[in-house]
Protein backbone atom coordinates (compact mmCIF):
# COMPACT_ATOMS: atom_id res chain seq x y z
CA UNK A 1 0.00 0.00 0.00
CA UNK A 2 2.82 2.41 0.86
CA UNK A 3 4.39 1.76 -2.52
CA UNK A 4 1.11 2.68 -4.20
CA UNK A 5 0.91 5.88 -2.15
CA UNK A 6 4.45 6.80 -3.11
CA UNK A 7 3.55 6.37 -6.75
CA UNK A 8 0.26 8.29 -6.50
CA UNK A 9 1.52 11.32 -4.55
CA UNK A 10 3.43 12.93 -7.43
CA UNK A 11 0.39 12.47 -9.69
CA UNK A 12 -1.94 14.09 -7.19
CA UNK A 13 0.45 16.98 -6.64
CA UNK A 14 0.86 17.46 -10.39
CA UNK A 15 -2.91 17.52 -10.94
CA UNK A 16 -3.40 19.99 -8.11
CA UNK A 17 -0.67 22.27 -9.49
CA UNK A 18 -2.19 22.08 -12.99
CA UNK A 19 -5.64 23.03 -11.64
CA UNK A 20 -4.17 25.91 -9.61
CA UNK A 21 -2.42 27.32 -12.68
CA UNK A 22 -5.65 27.14 -14.67
CA UNK A 23 -7.59 28.99 -12.02
CA UNK A 24 -4.95 31.72 -11.99
CA UNK A 25 -4.83 32.08 -15.78
CA UNK A 26 -6.01 35.50 -17.13
CA UNK A 27 -9.45 35.96 -18.74
CA UNK A 28 -9.74 35.97 -22.54
CA UNK A 29 -8.41 39.16 -24.14
CA UNK A 30 -11.12 41.67 -24.97
CA UNK A 31 -13.74 39.46 -23.36
CA UNK A 32 -15.94 40.51 -20.48
CA UNK A 33 -13.15 41.40 -18.10
CA UNK A 34 -11.26 43.64 -20.53
CA UNK A 35 -11.82 47.35 -20.83
CA UNK A 36 -13.55 48.70 -23.94
CA UNK A 37 -10.46 50.57 -25.10
CA UNK A 38 -8.20 47.50 -24.86
CA UNK A 39 -6.72 46.19 -28.10
CA UNK A 40 -7.82 42.80 -29.43
CA UNK A 41 -4.86 40.61 -28.46
CA UNK A 42 -3.98 36.96 -28.96
CA UNK A 43 -6.69 34.79 -27.48
CA UNK A 44 -5.82 32.06 -24.97
CA UNK A 45 -6.30 28.56 -26.29
CA UNK A 46 -7.73 27.01 -23.11
CA UNK A 47 -11.42 26.19 -23.57
CA UNK A 48 -12.93 25.08 -20.28
CA UNK A 49 -16.60 24.41 -21.15
CA UNK A 50 -18.32 23.08 -24.24
CA UNK A 51 -21.53 24.79 -25.42
CA UNK A 52 -24.14 23.54 -27.84
CA UNK A 53 -24.83 27.11 -28.99
CA UNK A 54 -22.96 30.40 -28.70
CA UNK A 55 -25.28 33.42 -29.06
CA UNK A 56 -23.72 36.63 -30.36
CA UNK A 57 -25.87 39.74 -29.83
CA UNK A 58 -24.74 42.75 -31.89
CA UNK A 59 -25.12 45.82 -29.69
CA UNK A 60 -24.21 49.50 -29.97
CA UNK A 61 -22.15 51.02 -27.17
CA UNK A 62 -24.95 53.28 -25.91
CA UNK A 63 -27.70 50.62 -25.95
CA UNK A 64 -27.49 49.98 -22.20
CA UNK A 65 -31.26 49.83 -21.80
CA UNK A 66 -31.75 47.22 -24.53
CA UNK A 67 -29.03 45.02 -23.05
CA UNK A 68 -30.57 45.25 -19.59
CA UNK A 69 -33.98 44.29 -20.97
CA UNK A 70 -32.46 41.22 -22.62
CA UNK A 71 -30.75 40.30 -19.34
CA UNK A 72 -34.08 40.55 -17.52
CA UNK A 73 -36.11 38.60 -20.12
CA UNK A 74 -34.87 35.77 -22.32
CA UNK A 75 -31.36 35.70 -20.82
CA UNK A 76 -32.77 35.42 -17.30
CA UNK A 77 -35.07 32.63 -18.46
CA UNK A 78 -32.07 30.88 -20.02
CA UNK A 79 -29.91 31.15 -16.90
CA UNK A 80 -32.74 29.75 -14.75
CA UNK A 81 -33.48 26.87 -17.14
CA UNK A 82 -32.45 23.50 -15.65
CA UNK A 83 -30.69 22.26 -18.82
CA UNK A 84 -30.23 25.15 -21.26
CA UNK A 85 -28.23 27.23 -18.79
CA UNK A 86 -25.27 24.86 -19.22
CA UNK A 87 -25.64 24.50 -22.98
CA UNK A 88 -25.70 28.12 -24.16
CA UNK A 89 -23.21 30.99 -23.92
CA UNK A 90 -24.56 34.51 -24.62
CA UNK A 91 -22.28 37.45 -25.39
CA UNK A 92 -23.01 41.04 -26.44
CA UNK A 93 -20.71 42.21 -29.27
CA UNK A 94 -19.59 45.81 -28.74
CA UNK A 95 -16.94 47.90 -30.49
CA UNK A 96 -14.07 48.71 -28.15
CA UNK A 97 -13.83 52.25 -29.50
CA UNK A 98 -16.38 55.02 -29.83
CA UNK A 99 -16.22 57.36 -32.82
CA UNK A 100 -14.17 60.43 -31.86
CA UNK A 101 -16.07 62.64 -34.32
CA UNK A 102 -19.29 64.15 -32.89
CA UNK A 103 -22.40 63.08 -34.80
CA UNK A 104 -23.06 66.69 -35.88
CA UNK A 105 -19.65 66.82 -37.56
CA UNK A 106 -19.78 63.55 -39.52
CA UNK A 107 -20.50 63.18 -43.20
CA UNK A 108 -23.35 60.85 -42.27
CA UNK A 109 -24.61 59.22 -39.07
CA UNK A 110 -23.54 55.74 -40.21
CA UNK A 111 -19.76 56.22 -40.37
CA UNK A 112 -17.00 58.03 -38.47
CA UNK A 113 -15.83 60.30 -41.30
CA UNK A 114 -15.34 63.99 -40.52
CA UNK A 115 -17.42 66.46 -42.54
CA UNK A 116 -14.38 68.44 -43.64
CA UNK A 117 -15.82 71.86 -44.52
CA UNK A 118 -13.35 74.75 -44.26
CA UNK A 119 -13.71 78.36 -45.43
CA UNK A 120 -17.10 77.88 -47.14
CA UNK A 121 -17.86 80.23 -50.03
CA UNK A 122 -21.04 82.00 -48.89
CA UNK A 123 -23.44 84.52 -50.42
CA UNK A 124 -22.20 84.09 -53.97
CA UNK A 125 -22.60 81.80 -56.97
CA UNK A 126 -19.98 79.08 -57.47
CA UNK A 127 -19.00 77.41 -60.74
CA UNK A 128 -18.66 73.70 -59.97
CA UNK A 129 -16.08 73.02 -62.72
CA UNK A 130 -13.56 75.24 -64.45
CA UNK A 131 -10.94 74.70 -67.15
CA UNK A 132 -7.35 75.85 -66.98
CA UNK A 133 -6.12 78.34 -69.57
CA UNK A 134 -3.93 75.84 -71.42
CA UNK A 135 -6.56 73.09 -71.76
CA UNK A 136 -6.80 71.98 -75.37
CA UNK A 137 -10.19 71.87 -77.06
CA UNK A 138 -9.95 68.54 -78.83
CA UNK A 139 -13.20 66.90 -79.87
CA UNK A 140 -13.63 63.36 -78.47
CA UNK A 141 -16.16 61.02 -80.01
CA UNK A 142 -18.20 60.55 -76.83
CA UNK A 143 -21.80 61.60 -77.33
CA UNK A 144 -22.94 60.89 -73.77
CA UNK A 145 -20.85 61.96 -70.76
CA UNK A 146 -21.85 61.99 -67.09
CA UNK A 147 -20.51 62.78 -63.66
CA UNK A 148 -21.91 61.96 -60.22
CA UNK A 149 -21.66 64.02 -57.06
CA UNK A 150 -22.74 63.99 -53.45
CA UNK A 151 -23.99 66.98 -51.47
CA UNK A 152 -22.43 67.27 -48.00
CA UNK A 153 -24.26 70.48 -47.03
CA UNK A 154 -27.45 71.90 -48.63
CA UNK A 155 -26.97 73.73 -51.94
CA UNK A 156 -29.17 75.17 -54.69
CA UNK A 157 -28.22 74.63 -58.35
CA UNK A 158 -29.16 77.72 -60.37
CA UNK A 159 -27.78 76.90 -63.84
CA UNK A 160 -26.54 74.00 -65.96
CA UNK A 161 -23.79 74.53 -68.52
CA UNK A 162 -21.81 73.02 -71.40
CA UNK A 163 -18.26 73.45 -72.68
CA UNK A 164 -17.88 74.94 -76.17
CA UNK A 165 -15.31 74.56 -78.92
CA UNK A 166 -13.04 77.59 -79.10
CA UNK A 167 -12.76 77.07 -82.86
CA UNK A 168 -16.49 77.57 -83.37
CA UNK A 169 -17.93 80.97 -84.19
CA UNK A 170 -20.73 81.37 -81.67
CA UNK A 171 -22.49 78.30 -80.34
CA UNK A 172 -22.93 75.65 -83.05
CA UNK A 173 -24.18 72.62 -81.10
CA UNK A 174 -27.32 70.86 -79.95
CA UNK A 175 -26.83 69.48 -76.43
CA UNK A 176 -29.19 68.35 -73.68
CA UNK A 177 -28.10 68.51 -70.03
CA UNK A 178 -30.06 66.62 -67.38
CA UNK A 179 -29.68 66.30 -63.62
CA UNK A 180 -30.92 63.07 -62.03
CA UNK A 181 -31.24 62.02 -58.45
CA UNK A 182 -29.39 58.72 -58.03
CA UNK A 183 -31.55 55.68 -58.86
CA UNK A 184 -34.34 57.86 -60.32
CA UNK A 185 -35.32 57.55 -63.98
CA UNK A 186 -36.94 60.98 -64.32
CA UNK A 187 -34.68 64.04 -64.47
CA UNK A 188 -35.11 66.71 -61.80
CA UNK A 189 -34.46 69.40 -64.39
CA UNK A 190 -33.26 69.74 -67.99
CA UNK A 191 -31.46 72.44 -69.99
CA UNK A 192 -31.37 72.33 -73.81
CA UNK A 193 -28.70 74.18 -75.76
CA UNK A 194 -28.89 74.98 -79.49
CA UNK A 195 -27.52 77.70 -81.83
CA UNK A 196 -30.63 79.90 -81.48
CA UNK A 197 -30.92 79.24 -77.71
CA UNK A 198 -27.47 78.89 -76.19
CA UNK A 199 -27.87 80.77 -72.91
CA UNK A 200 -25.23 83.01 -71.36
CA UNK A 201 -21.47 82.64 -71.77
CA UNK A 202 -19.44 82.64 -68.55
CA UNK A 203 -15.70 81.96 -68.82
CA UNK A 204 -15.43 78.82 -71.00
CA UNK A 205 -19.01 77.59 -70.59
CA UNK A 206 -22.49 78.41 -71.80
CA UNK A 207 -25.10 78.37 -69.02
CA UNK A 208 -28.87 78.22 -68.86
CA UNK A 209 -30.93 78.82 -65.70
CA UNK A 210 -33.00 75.96 -64.27
CA UNK A 211 -35.79 75.66 -61.74
CA UNK A 212 -34.22 76.01 -58.33
CA UNK A 213 -34.46 73.22 -55.76
CA UNK A 214 -32.63 72.87 -52.47
CA UNK A 215 -30.50 69.74 -52.72
CA UNK A 216 -30.25 68.48 -49.12
CA UNK A 217 -27.32 66.99 -47.27
CA UNK A 218 -26.56 63.45 -48.54
CA UNK A 219 -28.28 64.11 -51.88
CA UNK A 220 -26.60 62.10 -54.62
CA UNK A 221 -27.04 63.14 -58.21
CA UNK A 222 -25.76 62.60 -61.73
CA UNK A 223 -25.42 65.21 -64.47
CA UNK A 224 -25.67 63.81 -68.00
CA UNK A 225 -24.60 65.69 -71.15
CA UNK A 226 -25.93 64.27 -74.40
CA UNK A 227 -25.05 65.48 -77.88
CA UNK A 228 -27.92 65.58 -80.37
CA UNK A 229 -25.43 66.02 -83.24
CA UNK A 230 -23.39 63.43 -85.11
CA UNK A 231 -20.11 64.58 -83.59
CA UNK A 232 -19.22 64.18 -79.94
CA UNK A 233 -19.19 66.50 -76.96
CA UNK A 234 -16.42 68.84 -75.87
CA UNK A 235 -15.54 66.95 -72.71
CA UNK A 236 -12.69 66.48 -70.29
CA UNK A 237 -11.40 63.77 -68.04
CA UNK A 238 -12.20 64.58 -64.40
CA UNK A 239 -8.48 64.93 -63.66
CA UNK A 240 -8.20 67.78 -66.19
CA UNK A 241 -10.79 70.08 -64.64
CA UNK A 242 -10.78 72.05 -61.40
CA UNK A 243 -13.57 71.08 -59.01
CA UNK A 244 -14.81 74.02 -56.95
CA UNK A 245 -16.38 72.35 -53.92
CA UNK A 246 -17.30 75.57 -52.09
CA UNK A 247 -15.03 74.73 -49.18
CA UNK A 248 -16.12 71.09 -48.97
CA UNK A 249 -19.93 71.18 -49.39
CA UNK A 250 -19.97 68.74 -52.31
CA UNK A 251 -17.84 65.87 -53.59
CA UNK A 252 -17.48 64.43 -57.07
CA UNK A 253 -17.88 60.63 -57.04
CA UNK A 254 -15.45 58.82 -59.32
CA UNK A 255 -15.02 55.14 -60.01
CA UNK A 256 -11.24 55.54 -60.28
CA UNK A 257 -8.86 54.37 -62.95
CA UNK A 258 -9.31 50.71 -63.86
CA UNK A 259 -12.46 50.35 -61.72
CA UNK A 260 -15.92 49.41 -62.89
CA UNK A 261 -18.14 52.47 -63.47
CA UNK A 262 -20.97 53.09 -61.03
CA UNK A 263 -24.26 51.57 -62.10
CA UNK A 264 -26.07 54.92 -62.36
CA UNK A 265 -23.54 56.52 -64.72
CA UNK A 266 -24.58 57.00 -68.34
CA UNK A 267 -22.11 57.02 -71.19
CA UNK A 268 -18.51 57.85 -70.34
CA UNK A 269 -17.40 59.20 -66.96
CA UNK A 270 -16.20 62.76 -67.44
CA UNK A 271 -17.24 66.41 -67.60
CA UNK A 272 -18.76 68.14 -70.64
CA UNK A 273 -19.83 71.30 -68.85
CA UNK A 274 -20.78 72.26 -65.33
CA UNK A 275 -23.31 73.85 -63.03
CA UNK A 276 -23.58 76.96 -60.89
CA UNK A 277 -24.72 76.64 -57.29
CA UNK A 278 -25.04 78.54 -54.02
CA UNK A 279 -24.64 77.31 -50.45
CA UNK A 280 -27.80 77.44 -48.34
CA UNK A 281 -28.14 78.25 -44.63
CA UNK A 282 -24.74 79.96 -44.50
CA UNK A 283 -25.23 81.44 -41.02
CA UNK A 284 -26.10 78.03 -39.58
CA UNK A 285 -23.02 76.53 -41.25
CA UNK A 286 -20.73 79.20 -39.78
CA UNK A 287 -22.22 78.68 -36.33
CA UNK A 288 -21.67 74.93 -36.65
CA UNK A 289 -18.03 75.41 -37.66
CA UNK A 290 -17.33 77.92 -34.87
CA UNK A 291 -18.81 75.63 -32.21
CA UNK A 292 -16.82 72.56 -33.33
CA UNK A 293 -13.87 72.88 -30.91
CA UNK A 294 -16.08 72.96 -27.80
CA UNK A 295 -18.32 70.24 -29.20
CA UNK A 296 -15.28 68.00 -29.70
CA UNK A 297 -14.11 68.58 -26.12
CA UNK A 298 -17.56 67.68 -24.78
CA UNK A 299 -17.77 64.63 -27.04
CA UNK A 300 -14.38 63.23 -25.96
CA UNK A 301 -15.37 63.69 -22.32
CA UNK A 302 -18.61 61.79 -22.98
CA UNK A 303 -16.64 59.00 -24.67
CA UNK A 304 -14.46 58.60 -21.57
CA UNK A 305 -17.58 58.43 -19.41
CA UNK A 306 -19.08 55.86 -21.79
CA UNK A 307 -15.90 53.77 -21.59
CA UNK A 308 -16.13 53.78 -17.80
CA UNK A 309 -19.81 52.78 -17.85
CA UNK A 310 -19.13 49.94 -20.29
CA UNK A 311 -16.23 48.68 -18.20
CA UNK A 312 -18.44 48.68 -15.11
CA UNK A 313 -21.28 46.96 -16.99
CA UNK A 314 -18.87 44.31 -18.24
CA UNK A 315 -17.44 43.64 -14.78
CA UNK A 316 -20.93 43.27 -13.30
CA UNK A 317 -22.49 40.98 -15.91
CA UNK A 318 -19.48 39.28 -17.53
CA UNK A 319 -21.36 38.97 -20.84
CA UNK A 320 -19.65 41.46 -23.19
CA UNK A 321 -17.01 40.87 -25.85
CA UNK A 322 -15.23 44.09 -26.82
CA UNK A 323 -13.90 43.82 -30.38
CA UNK A 324 -11.18 46.07 -31.78
CA UNK A 325 -13.51 48.15 -33.99
CA UNK A 326 -14.84 51.72 -33.96
CA UNK A 327 -18.50 51.19 -33.12
CA UNK A 328 -20.50 52.58 -36.08
CA UNK A 329 -23.17 51.12 -38.35
CA UNK A 330 -20.76 50.82 -41.30
CA UNK A 331 -18.40 48.75 -39.12
CA UNK A 332 -20.98 46.18 -38.01
CA UNK A 333 -19.69 43.53 -40.49
CA UNK A 334 -16.19 43.97 -39.04
CA UNK A 335 -17.60 43.61 -35.51
CA UNK A 336 -19.16 40.31 -36.52
CA UNK A 337 -15.96 38.92 -38.09
CA UNK A 338 -14.00 39.85 -34.96
CA UNK A 339 -16.57 38.05 -32.82
CA UNK A 340 -16.33 34.92 -34.97
CA UNK A 341 -12.57 34.95 -34.42
CA UNK A 342 -13.03 35.44 -30.67
CA UNK A 343 -15.51 32.54 -30.54
CA UNK A 344 -13.27 30.11 -32.40
CA UNK A 345 -10.17 30.96 -30.40
CA UNK A 346 -11.73 30.97 -26.92
CA UNK A 347 -14.78 28.70 -26.97
CA UNK A 348 -15.73 25.09 -27.65
CA UNK A 349 -19.13 24.96 -29.37
CA UNK A 350 -21.30 23.31 -32.05
CA UNK A 351 -23.46 26.13 -33.43
CA UNK A 352 -23.49 29.92 -33.41
CA UNK A 353 -26.66 32.05 -33.30
CA UNK A 354 -26.36 35.69 -34.33
CA UNK A 355 -29.00 38.28 -33.39
CA UNK A 356 -29.36 41.99 -32.55
CA UNK A 357 -30.07 43.74 -29.25
CA UNK A 358 -33.49 45.00 -30.44
CA UNK A 359 -34.76 41.48 -31.22
CA UNK A 360 -37.11 39.13 -29.43
CA UNK A 361 -35.53 35.66 -29.24
CA UNK A 362 -37.07 32.38 -28.05
CA UNK A 363 -34.05 30.17 -27.35
CA UNK A 364 -36.14 27.30 -26.02
CA UNK A 365 -38.04 27.19 -29.32
CA UNK A 366 -34.72 27.35 -31.19
CA UNK A 367 -33.42 24.29 -29.32
CA UNK A 368 -36.67 22.38 -29.84
CA UNK A 369 -36.49 23.05 -33.56
CA UNK A 370 -32.85 21.96 -33.74
CA UNK A 371 -33.86 18.61 -32.25
CA UNK A 372 -37.05 18.22 -34.33
CA UNK A 373 -35.41 19.06 -37.66
CA UNK A 374 -31.97 17.62 -36.87
CA UNK A 375 -30.40 20.99 -37.63
CA UNK A 376 -26.85 20.41 -36.48
CA UNK A 377 -24.85 19.15 -39.45
CA UNK A 378 -21.71 20.66 -41.00
CA UNK A 379 -21.66 23.46 -43.61
CA UNK A 380 -25.08 24.52 -42.42
CA UNK A 381 -26.94 27.88 -42.41
CA UNK A 382 -30.41 28.14 -40.88
CA UNK A 383 -32.44 31.33 -41.27
CA UNK A 384 -35.07 33.25 -43.24
CA UNK A 385 -33.44 34.11 -46.56
CA UNK A 386 -33.98 37.09 -48.82
CA UNK A 387 -33.57 36.25 -52.51
CA UNK A 388 -32.72 38.63 -55.38
CA UNK A 389 -32.62 41.58 -52.97
CA UNK A 390 -31.89 44.79 -54.91
CA UNK A 391 -28.67 46.65 -54.09
CA UNK A 392 -29.32 50.18 -52.79
CA UNK A 393 -27.08 52.90 -54.20
CA UNK A 394 -28.20 55.66 -51.81
CA UNK A 395 -29.19 56.17 -48.17
CA UNK A 396 -28.41 54.15 -45.07
CA UNK A 397 -27.98 50.90 -47.03
CA UNK A 398 -25.93 52.48 -49.82
CA UNK A 399 -23.66 49.99 -51.53
CA UNK A 400 -21.13 51.23 -54.09
CA UNK A 401 -18.60 48.40 -53.72
CA UNK A 402 -20.78 45.50 -54.89
CA UNK A 403 -21.32 45.92 -58.65
CA UNK A 404 -24.24 43.52 -59.21
CA UNK A 405 -27.83 44.82 -59.16
CA UNK A 406 -28.89 42.16 -56.61
CA UNK A 407 -27.27 40.49 -53.60
CA UNK A 408 -26.74 36.74 -53.21
CA UNK A 409 -29.18 35.04 -50.84
CA UNK A 410 -28.73 36.25 -47.26
CA UNK A 411 -30.47 35.55 -43.97
CA UNK A 412 -32.37 38.30 -42.18
CA UNK A 413 -30.29 39.80 -39.41
CA UNK A 414 -32.87 39.26 -36.66
CA UNK A 415 -31.52 35.77 -36.16
CA UNK A 416 -29.76 32.92 -37.93
CA UNK A 417 -27.69 29.87 -36.98
CA UNK A 418 -24.48 28.65 -38.61
CA UNK A 419 -22.40 25.54 -37.99
CA UNK A 420 -19.00 25.55 -36.33
CA UNK A 421 -17.07 24.83 -39.54
CA UNK A 422 -18.56 27.95 -41.18
CA UNK A 423 -17.63 30.06 -38.16
CA UNK A 424 -14.09 28.67 -38.37
CA UNK A 425 -13.86 29.52 -42.08
CA UNK A 426 -15.06 33.07 -41.44
CA UNK A 427 -12.65 33.48 -38.53
CA UNK A 428 -9.63 32.17 -40.44
CA UNK A 429 -10.40 34.46 -43.40
CA UNK A 430 -11.52 37.49 -41.39
CA UNK A 431 -8.45 39.50 -42.38
CA UNK A 432 -9.15 39.06 -46.10
CA UNK A 433 -12.94 39.13 -46.37
CA UNK A 434 -14.23 42.43 -47.76
CA UNK A 435 -16.93 44.07 -45.67
CA UNK A 436 -19.98 45.59 -47.33
CA UNK A 437 -22.61 48.05 -46.09
CA UNK A 438 -24.51 45.65 -43.81
CA UNK A 439 -23.63 42.51 -41.89
CA UNK A 440 -26.56 40.55 -43.35
CA UNK A 441 -25.68 41.21 -47.01
CA UNK A 442 -21.96 40.82 -46.24
CA UNK A 443 -22.72 37.38 -44.84
CA UNK A 444 -24.59 36.47 -48.02
CA UNK A 445 -21.67 37.54 -50.21
CA UNK A 446 -19.15 35.66 -48.05
CA UNK A 447 -21.29 32.51 -48.01
CA UNK A 448 -21.66 32.56 -51.80
CA UNK A 449 -18.00 31.52 -51.91
CA UNK A 450 -18.53 28.26 -49.99
CA UNK A 451 -22.15 27.37 -50.79
CA UNK A 452 -23.47 26.17 -47.42
CA UNK A 453 -26.62 24.09 -47.10
CA UNK A 454 -29.36 26.65 -46.47
CA UNK A 455 -32.36 25.69 -44.36
CA UNK A 456 -35.20 28.16 -44.98
CA UNK A 457 -37.38 28.91 -41.96
CA UNK A 458 -39.91 31.76 -41.98
CA UNK A 459 -40.16 31.70 -38.18
CA UNK A 460 -37.02 33.86 -38.11
CA UNK A 461 -39.05 36.99 -38.81
CA UNK A 462 -37.53 39.67 -41.03
CA UNK A 463 -39.92 42.48 -40.09
CA UNK A 464 -41.37 43.81 -36.86
CA UNK A 465 -44.40 41.61 -36.40
CA UNK A 466 -45.59 38.97 -33.96
CA UNK A 467 -46.39 35.39 -34.92
CA UNK A 468 -47.14 32.46 -32.67
CA UNK A 469 -44.12 30.15 -32.59
CA UNK A 470 -41.70 32.76 -33.92
CA UNK A 471 -38.02 32.24 -33.21
CA UNK A 472 -37.07 35.91 -33.55
CA UNK A 473 -38.57 39.28 -34.40
CA UNK A 474 -36.65 42.57 -34.86
CA UNK A 475 -36.78 46.32 -34.26
CA UNK A 476 -38.39 46.56 -30.82
CA UNK A 477 -37.98 49.22 -28.16
CA UNK A 478 -36.96 48.18 -24.63
CA UNK A 479 -40.56 48.62 -23.44
CA UNK A 480 -41.94 46.52 -26.31
CA UNK A 481 -39.46 43.71 -25.65
CA UNK A 482 -40.47 43.69 -21.99
CA UNK A 483 -44.16 43.47 -22.88
CA UNK A 484 -43.57 40.64 -25.37
CA UNK A 485 -41.77 38.63 -22.73
CA UNK A 486 -44.43 39.30 -20.10
CA UNK A 487 -47.02 37.78 -22.44
CA UNK A 488 -44.69 34.87 -23.19
CA UNK A 489 -44.25 34.07 -19.49
CA UNK A 490 -47.90 34.57 -18.56
CA UNK A 491 -49.57 32.89 -21.53
CA UNK A 492 -46.89 30.95 -23.38
CA UNK A 493 -47.38 33.18 -26.43
CA UNK A 494 -45.73 36.61 -26.85
CA UNK A 495 -48.44 37.75 -29.26
CA UNK A 496 -51.66 37.18 -27.34
CA UNK A 497 -53.35 35.67 -24.31
CA UNK A 498 -56.21 33.32 -25.09
CA UNK A 499 -59.36 33.92 -23.03
CA UNK A 500 -59.92 31.10 -20.59
From Swiss-Prot:
<dbReference type="GO" id="GO:0008376">
    <property type="term" value="F:acetylgalactosaminyltransferase activity"/>
</dbReference>
<dbReference type="GO" id="GO:0006486">
    <property type="term" value="P:protein glycosylation"/>
</dbReference>
<keyword id="KW-0325">Glycoprotein</keyword>
<keyword id="KW-0451">Lissencephaly</keyword>
<dbReference type="Pfam" id="PF01762">
    <property type="entry name" value="Galactosyl_T"/>
</dbReference>
<dbReference type="GO" id="GO:0006493">
    <property type="term" value="P:protein O-linked glycosylation"/>
</dbReference>
<dbReference type="GO" id="GO:0000139">
    <property type="term" value="C:Golgi membrane"/>
</dbReference>
<keyword id="KW-0912">Congenital muscular dystrophy</keyword>
<dbReference type="GO" id="GO:0005783">
    <property type="term" value="C:endoplasmic reticulum"/>
</dbReference>
<keyword id="KW-1215">Dystroglycanopathy</keyword>
<keyword id="KW-1133">Transmembrane helix</keyword>
<keyword id="KW-0808">Transferase</keyword>
<comment type="similarity">
    <text>Belongs to the glycosyltransferase 31 family.</text>
</comment>
<dbReference type="GO" id="GO:0005789">
    <property type="term" value="C:endoplasmic reticulum membrane"/>
</dbReference>
<feature type="transmembrane region" description="Helical; Signal-anchor for type II membrane protein">
    <location>
        <begin position="7"/>
        <end position="23"/>
    </location>
</feature>
<keyword id="KW-0735">Signal-anchor</keyword>
<feature type="topological domain" description="Lumenal">
    <location>
        <begin position="24"/>
        <end position="500"/>
    </location>
</feature>
<feature type="glycosylation site" description="N-linked (GlcNAc...) asparagine">
    <location>
        <position position="174"/>
    </location>
</feature>
<keyword id="KW-0333">Golgi apparatus</keyword>
<keyword id="KW-0256">Endoplasmic reticulum</keyword>
<protein>
    <recommendedName>
        <fullName>UDP-GalNAc:beta-1,3-N-acetylgalactosaminyltransferase 2</fullName>
        <ecNumber>2.4.1.313</ecNumber>
    </recommendedName>
</protein>
<keyword id="KW-0328">Glycosyltransferase</keyword>
<feature type="glycosylation site" description="N-linked (GlcNAc...) asparagine">
    <location>
        <position position="116"/>
    </location>
</feature>
<keyword id="KW-0472">Membrane</keyword>
<keyword id="KW-0812">Transmembrane</keyword>
<feature type="topological domain" description="Cytoplasmic">
    <location>
        <begin position="1"/>
        <end position="6"/>
    </location>
</feature>
<comment type="pathway">
    <text>Protein modification; protein glycosylation.</text>
</comment>
<keyword id="KW-0225">Disease variant</keyword>
<dbReference type="InterPro" id="IPR002659">
    <property type="entry name" value="Glyco_trans_31"/>
</dbReference>
<dbReference type="GO" id="GO:0008194">
    <property type="term" value="F:UDP-glycosyltransferase activity"/>
</dbReference>
<comment type="function">
    <text>Beta-1,3-N-acetylgalactosaminyltransferase that synthesizes a unique carbohydrate structure, GalNAc-beta-1-3GlcNAc, on N- and O-glycans. Has no galactose nor galactosaminyl transferase activity toward any acceptor substrate.</text>
</comment>
Amino acid sequence: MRNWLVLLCPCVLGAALHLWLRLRSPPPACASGAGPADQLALFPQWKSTHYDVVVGVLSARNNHELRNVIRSTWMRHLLQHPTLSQRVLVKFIIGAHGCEVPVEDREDPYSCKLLNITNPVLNQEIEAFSLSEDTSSGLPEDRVVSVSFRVLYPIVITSLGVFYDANDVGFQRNITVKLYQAEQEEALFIARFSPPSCGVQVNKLWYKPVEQFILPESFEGTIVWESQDLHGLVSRNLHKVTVNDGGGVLRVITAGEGALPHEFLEGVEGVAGGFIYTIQEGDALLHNLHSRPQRLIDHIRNLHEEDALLKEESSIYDDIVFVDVVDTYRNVPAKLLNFYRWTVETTSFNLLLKTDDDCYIDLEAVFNRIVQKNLDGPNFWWGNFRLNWAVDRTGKWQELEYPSPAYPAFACGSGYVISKDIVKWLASNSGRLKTYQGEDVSMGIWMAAIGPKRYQDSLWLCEKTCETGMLSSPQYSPWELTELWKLKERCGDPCRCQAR
